[in-house]
Structures are given as C-alpha cells and as structure tokens.
Amino acid sequence: MSQVNIGINGFGRIGRIVFRNSVVHNTANVVAINDPFIDLEYMVYMLKYDSTHGVFNGDISTKDGKLIVNGKSIAVFAEKDPSNIPWGQAGAHYVVESTGVFTTIDKASAHIKGGAKKVVISAPSADAPMYVCGVNLDAYDPKAQVVSNASCTTNCLAPLAKVIHDKFGIVEGLMTTVHATTATQKTVDGPSAKDWRGGRAAAANIIPSSTGAAKAVGKVIPSLNGKLTGMAFRVPTTNVSVVDLTARLEKGASYDEIKAEVKRASENELKGILGYTEDAVVSQDFIGNSHSSIFDAAAGISLNNNFVKLVSWYDNEWGYSNRCLDLLVFMAQKDSA
C-alpha cells in the first residue's frame, strides 16, 4: 500500500510532533496543514526549533505560500471553520484533528465537508468511537468517519491493563498519572474558573487534577468497564509522564510472574506498543520514546499476590503522536481492503 496522504488541523504540540513523526518514521505523507493562528514564517520557526525534542533534522523553507520540508511541498491554510479547509483539493484523505476544540463527531465531521474522508481526533471524545493501538483495533468499523485516538494516558494504561487483565484478571484498580505540564496550564497564577487548582503556576507546584483516562479504558476494554478510575498530578516537567496502576487481581501472581508476562507481551503481540525495562531509569530517559507505554519492572511493588502497584512511563507527546499515525495507517489499510 502507498503512503496515506494526511492533513493536520492545529499545529500545536501534538500537531507538530505528529508531523515530525511522519518524517522520522516515514509512516504517512503530510500534504496539508491548517492553523489560523500561525503564519507561514512562524510555522517554519515552530517546526524547526523545539525545546523538548530539539532542532528538526531536515530542511525547512517556504515557497509560493507553501511549506517546503526536505524538498516536499505542503499546502498551508488558515481557516477557523474546519468546513472551509480544502482538504480534498490538497489531497488529504485523512485528517488529524489536533486543535483540542473539535472533539465530537458533529464538530469533527466539518472536515468531511472540505473533502477529507476520515478524521482522527487526537483527544478523548464524548461520542466518537475510541481506538487504542494494540488493544481494540479489531473493533474498528470502516463505516465510521470520525474516530478518537483516546488520550496519551489511556494509551499508556490500556495496553498494560490488557496484559494484566487477560492473564490474571483485574477485579478493580486505581490509577494515578504523574503528568508533565501541558500548554493549557499557567506560567504564573491566573484565572481558571472551571479548575481553580489548574490556574496555579505550573512551574511552582504539584497540582492535583482530574482525568478520565482510567475510566476510558473501560470503553476500549469492555470487560474492565466500571473497574478502573483515576486522577492526575501535574508536575513541573515539560515532557514524559508516568502511570501508577494499583490493582487487585483475581488470580494470585507473584511480582516476578507479572514481570515475566509483561515482558513476554512486549516482545510479541504488543511489540512497539508496550516496552519493558529493568534499568534504573528516570523521566528524561524516555524523551523521544515511540512506545505508548514502557513498563518499569524495578519500580513496581506487590503487597501480596493479589494486590500490586505497577509503573509504566510514556512520552506523552512523541509516543502518543506515533499512535495517531499508526491508527491512521491502520484505518487506511482497512478502508482500502
């Protein structure tokens, strides 16, 4: 199958990292970008320089109102209304919706009016079907025009939860994600009417926050529906987060048995999705890691054979953006079958 042509709506953190991933891994061909808040020259600058992932490894320039990357021409639009973006004209059959604004089927479907065939929302959705690579792609329905890639945290938790649940059975569990700062947070204390704590200075605080990531696992693994919930701590780091899953198991297992099962899955059916390490790692060691989830064998503990705490890392930008592309490519293959 030839490379799938894609468009990116919203050239923020995820939009730009999706683009970088498409170049590094050569998985998809970005033919168009839309962002009404960034002019072309600023787009070049933001793509070229990144405080977390470094300088872009390639040639970036502009010509005739288009972005030129490694000699390839990419159409650039600045439409606020997604229905006005000429995706079809640009040849973008699949669109990554990464603004964080158009996260429902109704809103994201506006891209279809512009000529896109399918839309992947790079965020959880209230009504679009959610897919997590390595977990529930077998449930993909080609009739769906709009789907969600869930959240970065769900992409970390779900593969690990699947391995544990399939082998040992999860009776119930609580998840905590220690999550890096994101763009919605404040540099200094500022107004945040819906989340007072979320308005406090990101660099100065550990901020408790809500997350639907654990509950969302129940949507992609129906047998876990109602068995998991969780919360988050936002911490003063710029990238890489870590999931702590504390679970009660149906079938008793030693921690060594759990480690062995996760390692087995990481080398087989979840290779490339779930990683495994026994090294004495810290968060910076995972910047640029393309796995959805990397199990930290040395960090977990068990109280007894039925009650365990499991730890798994994730680059919440790079790994997640990789999965956006993987999902698009999977959809394109299924849609053309």
From Swiss-Prot:
What the entry lists under CDD domains is as follows: GAPDH_I_C, GAPDH_I_N
A Pfam family cross-referenced in the UniProt record is Gp_dh_N
Site (Activates thiol group during catalysis) found at 179
Instruction: Name one cellular component (GO) term.
Output: cytosol
Subcellular location as annotated: Cytoplasm
Catalytically driven reaction(s) = D-glyceraldehyde 3-phosphate + phosphate + NAD(+) = (2R)-3-phospho-glyceroyl phosphate + NADH + H(+)
* Major localization class: cytoplasm
Matching SUPFAM superfamilies, A to Z? Answer: Glyceraldehyde-3-phosphate dehydrogenase-like, C-terminal domain, NAD(P)-binding Rossmann-fold domains
The EC number of this protein is 1.2.1.12
Give an example GO molecular function.
Answer: NADP binding
Task: List ligand-binding residues for D-glyceraldehyde 3-phosphate.
Answer: 151-153, 182, 211-212, 234
Which Gene3D superfamilies does this chain map to? Dihydrodipicolinate Reductase, domain 2, NAD(P)-binding Rossmann-like Domain
Pathway given in the UniProt record: Carbohydrate degradation; glycolysis; pyruvate from D-glyceraldehyde 3-phosphate: step 1/5
- Source domain of life: Eukaryota
The catalytic site is made up of: 152
Q: Which family does it belong to?
A: Belongs to the glyceraldehyde-3-phosphate dehydrogenase family.
Q: Which PANTHER family match?
A: GLYCERALDEHYDE 3-PHOSPHATE DEHYDROGENASE, GLYCERALDEHYDE-3-PHOSPHATE DEHYDROGENASE-RELATED
Stated name of the protein: Glyceraldehyde-3-phosphate dehydrogenase
Q: Which organism is it from?
A: Mycosarcoma maydis
| Encoding gene per record | GAPD
